[in-house]
């Protein structure tokens, strides 16, 4: 078991690794903007969360790019999450990530934003939300009191995705 607790980056304040699962404690969220077509919130990075139908065929790159650079985000931009509800506590997520400027396999602050937006909009009543991304399955749990989300944990499996060796020659 490995445990680290301090503000690390982008809203992450703690890490616990146990039994091949990683638990990331995320920053509290107290501001969620609701619009007719989407939600906007900052979970360590700004996230536009939009619920769509037929996520599998949705053009994440084209639509994400328009939103990321469009008003009101403009040059500062926002990550853009497209979401489809699978059942009462499970959502499929595809994310267009600023900086990468393309769809990514997974985005931790993004799935955290999706779980909170789904709860805020009453698409789920559970405080343990399952999320399916191209990179695998994740889970976000939280406490909510008077629209303030605390004790937010993102968790998923610890999987080696890359191994390399290199030789430094002088």
Residue ranges of predicted features:
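Active-site proximal loop and beta-alpha junction motif in alpha/beta enzyme cores
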Residues: 1-106, 113-170
């Amino acid at each position: 078991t490995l445990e680290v607790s301090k503000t690390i980056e982008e809203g992450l304040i703690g890490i616990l690794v146990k039994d091949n699962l990683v638990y990331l404690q995320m920053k509290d969220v107290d501001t969620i903007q609701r619009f007719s077509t989407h939600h906007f919130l900052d979970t360590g990075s700004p996230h536009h969360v939009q619920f769509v139908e037929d996520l599998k065929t949705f053009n994440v790159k084209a639509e994400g790019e328009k939103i990321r650079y469009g008003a009101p985000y403009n040059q500062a931009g926002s990550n853009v999450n497209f979401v489809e509800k699978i059942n009462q506590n499970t959502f499929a997520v595809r994310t267009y990530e600023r900086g990468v400027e393309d769809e990514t396999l997974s985005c931790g602050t993004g799935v955290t934003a999706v779980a909170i937006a789904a709860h805020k909009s009453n698409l789920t009543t559970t405080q343990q939300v399952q999320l399916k991304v191209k990179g695998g399955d994740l889970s976000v749990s939280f406490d909510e009191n008077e629209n303030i989300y605390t004790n937010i944990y993102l968790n998923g499996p610890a999987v080696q995705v890359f191994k390399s060796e290199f030789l430094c020659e002088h």
